[in-house]
Swiss-Prot record:
Lineage, opening ranks: Bacteria, Pseudomonadati, Campylobacterota, Epsilonproteobacteria, Campylobacterales
Source organism per UniProt: Sulfurimonas denitrificans (strain ATCC 33889 / DSM 1251)
Pathway: Nucleotide-sugar biosynthesis; ADP-L-glycero-beta-D-manno-heptose biosynthesis; ADP-L-glycero-beta-D-manno-heptose from D-glycero-beta-D-manno-heptose 7-phosphate: step 1/4; Nucleotide-sugar biosynthesis; ADP-L-glycero-beta-D-manno-heptose biosynthesis; ADP-L-glycero-beta-D-manno-heptose from D-glycero-beta-D-manno-heptose 7-phosphate: step 3/4
Keyword Nucleotide-binding: yes
The encoding gene: hldE
UniProt-listed Enzyme Commission number(s): 2.7.1.167, 2.7.7.70
Protein name: Bifunctional protein HldE
Keywords: ATP-binding, Carbohydrate metabolism, Kinase, Multifunctional enzyme, Nucleotide-binding, Nucleotidyltransferase, Transferase
Amino acid sequence: MKILKSFTPRILVIGDLMIDHYLWGNCERISPEAPVQIVDISKETTVLGGGGNVVNNLVALGAKVSVSGVIGNDENGVELLKLLREIDVNVDNIVIQEGRKTSKKSRVIAASQQILRYDKESKEEISKSSIEVILNSLAKDISRYDAVVLSDYSKGVLTKELCQGVISTCSKNGIKVLVDPKGSDYSKYSGAYLLTPNKKEAIQATKIDIKDKQSLKEALLKMKKDANLAISLITLSEDGVAIYDDEMKIFPTVAKEVFDVTGAGDTVIASIAFAISAGKSIEESAKFANLAAGVVVGKIGSATVSISEIEEYEASLHKSTSDAHIKGFEEIEAIVKRYKESGKKVVFTNGCFDILHVGHVKYLQIAKSFGDVLIVGLNSDTSVTRLKGPSRPVNIAEDRAYLLAALEAVDFVVPFEDDTPYELIKMIKPDTLVKGGDYEGKSVIGTEFAQELKLVDFVDGKSTTKTIQKIKGDLHV
């Protein structure tokens, strides 16, 4: 990973460039004109899509990226160039073709659900003159690149003539070509270093129903032979990545939580291209891509991932289960954002949990039942001392957090230094705030930031104080 972090590969992306346009709003009415929903738009966002998302991923990893493709002489084309320049991408080799529409996909989203998509684009093959310009530019600048990525979304840019021209030029100059393919005819990519279809795409292209390791191997071999590849590769979603060079190897997925698989394929080809350019083997590159995909599917939408995020993620995989669920303020803020964006209901409670007992466990189980994710705020040692006296806590915060995080009902534990979790609740803004039944009729800190307050009765006769008394022999039962 250190070598990858210190290396800046120069990568050219050629393919279908597009804009992903999102319109966010609320839908609470039906139109009087027709039986359709009315969406009141409150926010609009635009990001790079298609091959542009591969570019985004490469830039996030730290690559120096150039882009080649064809756009129209239109407003969307101007916007796309602006988005690329904003992330410091070389756009000198993008061709503007008269009469062609720049691809823009607009999605209307309400209540976290996509309810409509409309597209503006051209799908016909690009002109002969556009192909010549791209190939001439590649031949002139080939020494500037460590690898070339072809990102095919079947929008007419990556014709067979262009693909074969690119692969031929790169082959003569010792440059590897990696392809994210589309369609069932992989012959147009013949001679590439590798392709990265997903399982569904591989089945479509090879006509082999991949249902076990033997059929997977057959599909990999057929791809390798039919497209004259150095290496064949198939992404297997939650099962990881399979490759075939001289034998089949499967690298299992390492994703801990999956929020959204949108754009995961772009992350895979970008990370493999990045690692291959740094001189890594295909095995090392596949493992790196798996880690990158494991991070990106934990985000919402066509997201990207950095080397630092991958390093942190890899380190977290080696932590114990409990350690991985103990978070700081910044970490939990990002985690809560992802859960809420995916429509999950967040529950929060807090306490000292000094000597964990059955009353605590049952309380936390009930709290978890109010939503999808339970976050427990944990008073620090100094906070417990201020609240409970100089003899407390019995167990230090590190031990208390570890025990809580090991409980099935608890998703995350967040230690805090203040006497109350006010700032933590303010940041999280839980759907449900849970407190003990002894708060009946009392003011509860942070209720103004929660959608609802739930009071849960304690288990009779179970408390940390009584446990301590019993240990001391002061309580006879």
